[in-house]
UniProtKB/Swiss-Prot annotation:
Organism: Lactococcus lactis subsp. lactis
Residue ranges of DNA binding: 30-49
SUPFAM superfamilies with a match to the protein in the record: Homeodomain-like, Tetracyclin repressor-like, C-terminal domain
GO molecular function: DNA binding
Protein name per Swiss-Prot or TrEMBL: Uncharacterized HTH-type transcriptional regulator in lacX 3'region
PANTHER family with a match to the protein in the record: HTH-TYPE TRANSCRIPTIONAL REPRESSOR NEMR, TRANSCRIPTIONAL REGULATORY PROTEIN
Amino acid sequence: MEVYNLRNTKEKILTATEQLIYKKGYTGTSINDILDETATGKGQFYYYFDSKKEACLAVIDNHVKIWQKHLLNGILSRDESPLANLKEMLDWIYSDHAQKKIYYGCPVGNLVIELSALDEDFRKPLEQLFSDLQKKIAENLSALTGLLVKQNLPAAHAIIAQIQGSLLLLKVTQDLNVLESNFDLLKTSFEKVGEK
């Protein structure tokens, strides 16, 4: 029972940290914010995390694991058609935002924007995640085009930029139709690649 409570407390702190950073940013989130949100004391926070930075690194690690499970090793690694995989990638991202009332942007993209230039410890896992995503998208594009994966890396990079740009526009407009419209255009471009 005690082990469950300890794990539960750590998860509660991690979840609150993730949500606060998503909404307020890393700089805008204080340890006191996390303590208030979780109704825990400093001792409990510092039992699990040495610092706010360490808690944020755990948040990044959690995002990486989710993306690896659902997107990199899931959707983009399926034996379905590569066109279906690429479209499903967009649907997965869209569905995460469609259920929200306020659009804060991409949780990972927000971390990249705020933290990549501040600290290598933050930048490295985020860069690796985007590099892995680029490779998986390129693999699917290669199956569509017949070109080598390395030949499709620039196009995969551009797709990531379009996705992140669309999420940035969603954040600034607070209009889900913007994301839907941009993703529909991306899906159409995937179909055109598949026709060649």
